[in-house]
A protein has these predicted regions:
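N-terminal beta1-alpha1 cap of cysteine-dependent amidohydrolase-like domains
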Residues: 1-86
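Cysteine-nucleophile active-site neighborhood
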Residues: 67-145
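Surface-exposed loop/turn and secondary-structure junction residues enriched for glycine/proline
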Residues: 23-28, 33, 60, 104-107, ...
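Generic structural hydrophobic/aromatic packing signal, biased to beta-strands
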Residues: 30, 40, 60-62, 104, ...
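Residue-level signal for functionally critical sites in structured catalytic/ligand-binding pockets
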Residues: 15-16, 22-26, 42, 66-67, ...
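Short, charged/polar low-complexity linear motifs in solvent-exposed/disordered segments
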Residues: 37-39, 114, 164-165
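Amide-donor transfer/coupling interface in amidating biosynthetic enzymes
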Residues: 1-12, 128-170
Length: 170
């Protein structure tokens, strides 16, 4: 008798704007690695994120985006800040690539020192600079975020039965 397995469920947030470096191809690759035994939920900017009401999502994924798109996504996610914090506190795997992580900080500072208020979950801010990047921390919780990202990579590779020989966060 074959044991029934449930599909892995991945929510991809805002694929219409969060695909700056073609990162959605990684989701397609993952789907093939899992022999299509995965359910992909693509949440557009016009939709309520599935993570708001569903507790069975295995991974929340968002890729990098343009600076203008960051501002749109911040407005979209701010109403769900408490829910995001709740899920992260419960060790919900969340994979944010590129500048998507900046959205969860306190603010994003432009080159002219003007600030864009971000979702505000973590005590760090990002600084936009044409010729360099980046993140500055003014609180200890940023370390917890990075540790959680590393843990998430390890958990994903173990869950998928991949041999994790090293993880690079760029």
């Amino acid at each position: 008798m074959r044991k029934e397995t449930s599909k892995m469920k991945i929510e991809v947030l805002f694929p219409e704007v969060a695909n700056l470096y073609g990162d959605l191809s990684n989701i397609e690759y993952l789907k093939k690695c899992l022999n299509n035994d995965v359910e992909i939920i693509e949440t557009s900017l016009n939709d309520e994120p599935a993570f708001v009401k569903q507790d069975d999502i295995n991974l929340i994924f968002m890729a990098g985006m343009t600076e203008k798109s960051q501002e749109i996504v911040i407005k979209k996610l701010k109403p769900y800040a408490d829910r995001i914090d709740e899920l992260v506190s419960k060790n919900q795997p969340v994979l944010l690539l590129g500048n998507a992580m900046e959205i969860l900080g306190k603010f994003i500072e432009n080159e002219d020192e003007s600030q864009i208020r971000a979702v505000g979950l973590y005590h760090f801010y990002a600084h936009r600079d044409m010729f360099g990047l980046f993140g500055y921390t003014n609180g200890a919780r940023i370390n917890k975020v990075y540790v959680r990202i590393w843990w998430t990579f390890a958990q994903i590779t173990q869950t998928l039965n991949f041999n994790n020989i090293g993880t690079v966060i760029g």
